[in-house]
Amino acid sequence: VSRRSHASGFATRLLAWLAVRLRFLVVPAFAAAAVLAGLHADPFQTGGPVLDLIPKDSPALKAQADSLRLFRAPAGSDVIVVQRDPAGLSRDAQSRVIAQAVAVGRGHDRSGAQLAIPFINVPGAPASTGDSTTAITHLVFGGSYSPTERIRAAQGYLARVARPDGAPVGVTGVTPARIEQGTLILNRIGLVELLTVLVIAVIVLVVFRAPGAAVVTMATIGVAFPITLWALTEIARISGSPLPQEVEPLVVALLLGVVTDYAVFFLSEFRDQLRSGAESRDAATAAAQAVIPIVFTGGVILSLSLLALRASSLGFFRQLAPALAVTVAVAMLVSLVFVPALIALLGRFAVWPTRPQAEVDEAAPGRPIGPRIAHLAAGRPLAALIGIACVAVLVFAGLQARSLKLGVDVISGLPADSGPRVAARAAAAGFAPGALAPLEVIVRNRESALPPAGLAQLEQQLRSQPGYAGAVGPAEQVKGTSVQPFLTRDGRAARFVLVSDTDPLSPAAVRDLAHLQAQMPGLAGSAGLGGASVEYAGQTALAQSAVDAVSGDALKIALAVLLVNLVLMALFMRALLAPLVLLAVNVLSVAATLGLTVWFFQDVLGYPDITYYVPFAGAVLLVSLSSDYNVLIVGKIWAEGENRPMRDAIASAAPRASRA
């Protein structure tokens, strides 16, 4: 242990000495590297891949593949063209909707779609108003078409089918909504970044009362940001896949938080060294020697904790893990070298007008209030009372998370005037909302044909299920044609298509599906189909799979993150009980944060749900980021505890650490 401590101490002293002594080279070198990196950084691309939201072994994905294999065509698509005229679509416009869809099937349409599935709300059409005002056409494309290519092709299709009086509205569906969401993120992220940086600058300025401290923090962000984006660009280039657009806000939030924390750690220690009477360069060196181990340990813990996301079954989290880990690693490396060098270069201006401690004591005689409170709180009786009170508050706040509702409703989450949402609203004026993403129920009997009477009875039962506006199935299949969308030739597989009466990606639709799944054994048994297997396909089933996967992954990811934190904190502290207690507090604080989030967004603001991956990504960030503060506080207490009783060490170190 002593040899390892000596080696790490030598490395710390060497790095601190180099950063301070070579400050005139280090600062411009990092600035030049940031400029070059910014010229070659483009990891987030509009129209790039959407999130990999569904586990590869999802039953819904298998059912979707089975449906396509058995019936040769899906019941719907993720790209839908919408036409609507409140006065009614003309007969000519309706005829063009059908004719254009037929042209797609025959390969005579230049959109590139493999299949077009048109629906018009004519009188008697299921799950519709029946007033001939609305037409929706599901366009099915091959896998070689990128999301943006599909949307562009759908827009061209709409322009052709809607002229001159076809009342075009727009293109909607899951894929257009996600692309629109990504575009909005990329268009607004710059403003959000600017406002966030300005807020950080103001906070640092107010806390340190020193313009130089804000300059150091902003300069560090300015250097770390382009270098991080370049590193992520290289990862995307090597892997052959640009990062999902939804990742950028998480990367930005993490980078700004980590860089700000580390810069503040150095600045706070540098100010303390100056107040103790050290000269500027000596203070910079001493501050670097004190903070470098803390930043390095915190960065390693945070990076490895984020890599624990690789344990997820969701592609989104697996993609997120290396991106966030690299973000932390770059922030750590920049902070370890650039920040001490910049502080040494600026000298006292970095925290000007900081006064020596003697002047502070003279201006405010007596023991400072912070250490007195910390010394009082460190006494065991009062510490126990404070701990119990804090735990009670955290538990109460955390209990609010029980009402958390997870959703995947990407369309309804868009601004009201966005193209996909406008088109979806127009479609919902003529059809039930589920017409944009119908649910497929596939019933199969591997040994013999399914009884027609039983299928007819089951179809009637499905139409009466709560949460669904209509259903079609084998009873609607036209006999004597080669098209068999509901019943296979051998009669061993049947497909029922159900239309939800609510947003098909909402928590309500997922609950309706869960209720249907629970009722299906009884429904099938009463129809004489008890021996048949049942599968569920469609966007609602996929949304259910995604939410279930995240919920199922939550414990696995949490255990992985906590284990990494525990092991590394134990190595850093050379203890086991203290890391366990700190992790327990972290878990309670994360639960409380999640509970307050649920209360504010669902109860106060009235949102029906929270996007399903946000709470878990946020929880991982909170647990990991809090480890930085644990390392900082514990490191300072441990250092003070080498020469004084623990209570006095806490009284001395806690106020100084809290200022950072």
Task: Give the positions of each predicted feature.
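Short, conserved active-site loops that position catalytic residues or coordinate cofactors/metal ions
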Residues: 44-46, 78-83
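Short hinge/gating elements
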Residues: 48-51, 409-411
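Structured non-transmembrane domains adjacent to transmembrane bundles in polytopic membrane proteins
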Residues: 57-78, 85-175, 403-603, 607
